[in-house]
Swiss-Prot record:
InterPro entries: NonRcpt_TyrProt_Phosphatase, Prot-tyrosine_phosphatase-like, PTP_cat, Tyr_Pase_AS, Tyr_Pase_cat, Tyr_Pase_dom. The active site is at C354 (phosphocysteine intermediate). Residues 48-58, 104-116 have a biased composition (Polar residues). The modification Phosphoserine is found at S76, S122. Belongs to the protein-tyrosine phosphatase family. Non-receptor class subfamily. It comes from Rattus norvegicus. This is Tyrosine-protein phosphatase non-receptor type 20. Residues 1-58, 93-116 are annotated as: Disordered. Its EC number is 3.1.3.48. The lineage of its organism: Eukaryota, Metazoa, Chordata, Craniata, Vertebrata. One of its GO terms (biological process) is lymphangiogenesis.
Length: 421
């Protein structure tokens, strides 16, 4: 099977280094590539290791004012634009600076209603969630974890890059015909990130198209079920919420800001006012509650079917500490975020998206599976998990930095676990 990149090469295109080399998937309108210079991503191979020598060695052996709410990351305990939740144990409500509206241009949330079962999350709770404990934590399981930690610590950077190179050589197992159909081309954020036909998420009785993929990861007979999707476009917002409703998803993990480095990564697809729902043909979406922590935003939505009045609750969790380039400097915030998302998950596949729905989304899914595996005293293999992802959505985990970050996160979790008494 051909990847979107291979299709470009067949038509005489190069590797999307410049916007002028874009393929015209939309005939009169070109889509960007997920790897263009204007999109803030690092090149696959950085400066630490010479990529050509690694490759040789491998083959010898392989539109909103968002900055008003979330300015460039500043590590300050006195930043009044973010509600610091560390003292939340002394509060019994969410912030209520202005109960009229809450959205990307406001640092606002609302008092919890008496009937609400949602409670504000404290930093203490997040710290406890990050302390992953196996079901059985005795001398035998400790020894197994120590062996696992030692094996991971022995892996050098070169070994991890070789693994990533091997993943890059995978042949796509399926076609992308639906994504290339004329009526669907405007529904893709990037021309080189399309879902496989066999794993794409169908919409409605007609199985309409959305750029989203079912991801099922199997480890020791346990299955972990996700939807990996791109950040919604203005014209696909209704499709996105329809997908959430039809798949009974109760959690959305969003791992991007709407704008990063001056580039639009995802549109604001949620209602920003507590009084004005987002109206669609068959349903509307209401914002109920809102909380801003130091590193992610919690929004509680209700999707209400107009025909029946039946309501479906969704918790929207937006991670805001991923830098414009590369990966987070510290794994701590992301570990807490992933654990809170997992704790919040109840029904349907866990829906995850970034901008393209492959890079940060892949990192999230990989480490979430590893965390669940550790809890159940099972062994795990990061490369195997990523291989399974890539068989179901093209290009999951885009860069070697993201792949290395998976290892760094798991190492930190294991070290913290073994340090416990």
């Amino acid at each position: 099977m051909s990847s979107p990149g291979n299709v470009r090469q067949k038509h005489g295109r190069d590797n999307d280094e410049h916007e002028g080399d874009s393929d015209d998937l939309n005939l009169q309108k070109s889509l960007p590539s997920s790897s263009q210079q204007k999109t803030p991503t690092k090149p696959v191979f950085g400066n630490k290791v010479n990529s050509e020598s690694v490759k040789t060695s491998h083959h010898m052996s392989f539109s909103n004012k968002y900055d008003l709410v979330f300015p460039e990351p500043v590590e300050s305990d006195n930043d009044e634009t973010l509600w610091d939740v560390r003292d939340l144990s002394h509060r019994n409500r969410w912030s209520s600076v202005d109960p009229e509206s809450a959205g990307p241009s406001k640092t606002v949330s609302t008092v919890l209603s008496e009937s609400s079962t949602d409670t504000a999350v404290s930093e203490r709770e997040l710290t406890q969630l990050a302390q992953i404990r196996p079901l059985i934590f005795n001398s035998s399981s400790r020894a197994a974890l120590r062996d696992c930690l030692k094996a991971l610590q022995k892996k050098e950077e070169l070994d991890i890059i070789r693994e990533f190179l091997e993943l890059e050589e995978m042949i796509p197992p399926d076609d992308f015909k639906s994504g290339y159909e004329l009526q669907n081309r405007d529904k893709n954020r990037y021309r080189d990130i399309l879902p496989y036909d066999s794993t794409r998420v169908p919409l409605g009785k007609n199985k309409d198209y959305i750029n989203a993929s079912y991801i099922r990861i199997v480890n020791h007979e346990e299955e972990y079920f996700y939807i990996a999707t791109q950040g919604p476009l203005p014209d696909t917002i209704e499709d996105f919420w329809q997908m959430v409703l039809e798949n009974n998803c109760n959690v959305i993990a969003m791992i991007t800001r709407e704008i990063e480095g001056g580039v639009i990564k995802c549109c604001s697809y949620w209602p920003v006012s507590l009084k004005e729902p987002l109206e669609f043909k068959h349903f509307h979406v209401l914002l109920e509650n809102f909380q801003i922590t130091q590193y992610f935003v919690i929004r509680i939505f209700q999707i209400v079917k107009k025909s029946t009045g039946k309501s479906h609750s969704v918790k929207h969790l937006q991670f805001i500490k991923w830098p414009d380039h590369g990966t987070p400097a510290s794994a701590d915030f992301f570990i807490k975020y992933v654990r809170y998302v997992r704790k919040s998950h109840i029904t349907g596949p866990l829906l995850v998206h970034c901008s393209a729905g492959v890079g940060r989304t892949g990192v999230f899914i990989c480490v979430d599976v590893v965390f669940c595996t550790i809890e159940k005293n099972y062994s795990f293999n990061i490369m195997n998990i990523v291989t399974q992802m890539r068989k179901q959505r093209f290009g999951m985990i885009q860069t070697k930095e993201q792949y290395q970050f998976c290892y760094e996160i798991v190492l930190e979790v294991l070290q913290n676990l073994l340090a416990l008494n």
